[in-house]
Amino acid sequence: VIETDKQGLKVELGGSRANNLADNMEIFGLNPGSVNIVKIVYTTFGDIVKKLYPQLVPTYPAADDVINTTFLEAVAKRAGSNIASPDKPEFSPDNTIRETISKKNWSIAFESGKSTFTPAAQQTLDQLFNDLVIAGNLKVEVNGHTDNAGDFNENMKLSERRAFAVKEWLEKKSPSNFPEGRINITAHGSTKPIAPNETPEGKAKNRRVEIVMGK
């Protein structure tokens, strides 16, 4: 069932789906290059509920305590090579997003003047990864931005390298969830500031990666 929300976006509200063994192996992260999507969804929305209703849901069981893949692994072992391929979204080389579903700025910390992540970036990258895994059927556009410090052309190149670094990190972490064609990158350099560049705070806001998800 698909309904339109207050923003005019179409939202899937349910329906049923039958998964075969290969599909379950994929969503429980048992296939090479995949991650446990069930665990990510459970934890993400568990944290949301706990934050919204702290008195009703002060805590919830850890995912590892409620998700047991022993039976699934046993069935897969018995099936051997007689397992079909999982049903996964396909993305064409033309990765242009024609319908934007979500747009968000992420402050991913890089080494100054480089496209290398700082240790502080890890938590943000993990959160971004989880969000994109949950929305696994959507295309992703990674937009790199800088402040106005330094040479204009060098900033354009730097924003491209940083956007590519995010793309490469996601694809290496889970090739199955980020196949070729899902992620596209665009470099903007200092051309699209969201805050004045006259202050350190403004510059910090402009050094960002914008993630767009859509169809």
What are these regions (language model features)?
Residues 109, 116, 139-141, 184-186, ...:
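Structural recognition of the beta-strand scaffold that forms the well-ordered cores
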Residues 146-215:
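Periplasmic OmpA-like peptidoglycan-binding domain that tethers envelope proteins to the cell wall
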